[in-house]
From Swiss-Prot:
Annotated GO CC locations: plasma membrane
Keyword Flavoprotein among record annotations: no
Keyword Transmembrane helix: yes
Lineage, top ranks: Bacteria, Bacillati, Bacillota, Bacilli, Bacillales
Membrane-topology annotation of the record: Multi-pass membrane protein
InterPro entries: YdjM-like
Name recorded for this polypeptide: Uncharacterized protein YvsG
Length: 160
């Protein structure tokens, strides 16, 4: 998936969580957008990889793309880091939900992810798509609509 789809996936997931669980919607959406980019630190040409080129190059060299940073092990480590060092639960939850949305979206691609890293088994959802394809554009549109819906519901109440 492309960076914009990951960002919208993080925002959509976090606005839904804010709606259903009472989190702050603005903090959740912002941290979800950031969290949705974090797993791609392993890709030097990703949005986050270009912002942190040295870290990205190191992670990419050591692990490769869609391996460690796209795994449950990485999520567990990030959970301990965020819950220990980020006191605001809106932000820590948003980061984690954003990262989880990233893994789900990348598992929806042709190559899938190594969710059980260090195992070499790739996990891919049964219906999958090519990154940057028309199918991804439809997913992006759906995530955008979901985000708009939840933002509306959060700030204006019932829709119908």
């Amino acid at each position: 998936m492309t960076g914009k789809t990951h960002i919208m996936g993080g925002i959509a997931s976090c606005t839904a969580a804010a709606y259903y669980y009472g989190f702050d919607p603005v903090l959740m959406a912002a941290s979800g957008a950031v969290g949705a980019l974090i797993p791609d630190i392993c890709h030097t040409q990703s949005k986050i990889g270009r912002k942190f080129p040295i870290l990205s190059k190191v992670v990419s060299s050591v692990f490769g793309h869609r391996t460690f940073t796209h795994s449950l092990l990485f999520m567990l480590i990030m959970f301990f880091i965020t819950s220990t060092y980020i006191p605001d639960k809106n932000i820590s939850a948003g980061l984690m939900i954003g990262m989880a949305s990233h893994l789900i979206l990348d598992a929806w691609t042709v190559n899938g992810i190594k969710l059980l890293f260090p195992s070499t088994i790739r996990v891919r959802l049964p219906l999958y798509m090519k990154t940057g394809s028309f199918s991804e554009q439809l997913v992006l549109a759906g995530l955008t609509l979901a985000s708009c819906y939840y933002f509306y519901m959060l700030f204006h109440g019932r829709m119908f």
